[in-house]
Amino acid sequence: DAAQVPDFATAVQNLXHTLSEAA
C-alpha cells in the first residue's frame, strides 16, 4: 500500500531522532 511508505519514513525519522537524543 502506498500509505505505508510515508508511515515507514516517519518511523525511520522517529528512530533517528531517538538515537540522536540518546547519543
Curated annotation (Swiss-Prot):
Key word Repeat present: no
Name this polypeptide is given: Apolipophorin-3
Alphabetically ordered keywords of this record: Lipid transport, Secreted, Transport
CC annotations in GO: extracellular region
GO biological process: lipid transport
Cellular localization per UniProt: Secreted
Tissues in which the UniProt entry reports expression: Hemolymph.
Homology family: Belongs to the insect apolipophorin-3 family.
Protein role: Assists in the loading of diacylglycerol, generated from triacylglycerol stores in the fat body through the action of adipokinetic hormone, into lipophorin, the hemolymph lipoprotein. It increases the lipid carrying capacity of lipophorin by covering the expanding hydrophobic surface resulting from diacylglycerol uptake. It thus plays a critical role in the transport of lipids during flight in several species of insects.
Organism in which the protein naturally occurs: Melanoplus sanguinipes
